[in-house]
Structure formats: C-alpha cells, structure tokens
Amino acid sequence: MNAENNIPIIELDKKDTYLREISSKYSTHHYYDVSVCRESGSWRIELTRKAFASRLDKNYHGKLFEDHIEETRVFAAVLGNRQVGWIELGYDKWNNRLRVWQFLVEEECRTRGIGTLLMNHAVKIAKEKGARMLVLETQSNNATAISFYLNFGFELIGFDFAAYSNEDLEKKEVRLELGLKLQ
C-alpha cells in the first residue's frame, strides 16, 4: 500500500476528540546496550546493538493533549473510517524545536507506510513553523523504532541514564533523544 496516496491525515482538536489516552505495545529482540566509562579526564560512552536472550514485550500508555505541552497539535492517519495512527507535536519556543510527544501506529497497521506518512507531516509542520529541528524520545530497548528513526534521518542528540528509574542502564531501557536537523 502506498500510504502517501490513500491515507488522509486529519488534525484533531482538544475539544472534540474522543481519543485522550493511547495504548501501544511492541516486541523486540534487540536493544542498544549503553556503556559509560569515566577515565582520567574523559568520558567514553558507547551504544552497541545486542540481542536479548528472549523477546521483550513492552506496553505503553500515554495521553494526548497534556497541559504541559506548548502549542500542542495532534494529527491522525485515517484508514477507512478509523484512526490508525497518531502523532502529537509541541513547539518549544525557547530553543526553536518541534518535539514529537506521542507517535503511534496501531500494531496491525505497521509496516504500511503510515508512520512515514505521519513523520513526513511532522517535518512539514516543523518547517512551516520555522523550527530548526524535530526531536523525539525513544528507549534503547526499542530497536525497531530506533531503526525507523535512523532510516528517516534522525541522529542521536542525547540520552538520560536515569529518566525512568535509577536502574535504567541495568534494565536496558535508557532514554535516547533523537533529532532531525531542518535548518
């Protein structure tokens, strides 16, 4: 299916959208192992793709239109009469970046180009806004998403070894920040 020609993208409104909470799950066989080594006068940080001993299944629950997001815009991909993918964007005026706060394609609709369609739409919105970069967060254990973002042109711009817990390194779930330069 060529999503570009067949799937409309609509903008949702906070006042009339039925969808406030979103849920997703993903399975992965790989992760990026993050190692941090402090040596005399320097830090050495490596991210190495490795295989889990067995498949990891993760569930995610989030909300759209959170109050803390500045200039929120939410878009949905519509297949037939059903919304099957969403991307939530927020503009960070202080550093002129557009952030992807939520990005989800329903599991049965993945690998059909819907994610690419939504991300292309986010790039269009970011350029219209004059943002210098499109940024997002993912986790080091979501190798499939990381591959998608890297293939799209995103690069690693940062990480947080304790974003979710004090044991993120041990859990193989390190917050990664990825960015796509637009200017």
Regions found by a protein language model. Give the residues of each.
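Short, charged, low-hydrophobicity "junction" segments
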Residues: 1, 124-135
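C-terminal "cap" of GNAT-fold acetyltransferases
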Residues: 2-6, 132, 139-143, 152-155, ...
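Generic detector of contiguous secondary-structure segments
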Residues: 7-21, 131-146
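Acetyl-CoA-dependent GNAT
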Residues: 13-14, 18-101, 106-108, 119-121, ...
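Alpha-helix boundary/capping detector
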Residues: 44-49, 107, 115, 126, ...
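Conserved glycine-rich acetyl-CoA-binding loop
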Residues: 82, 106-120, 124, 128-129, ...
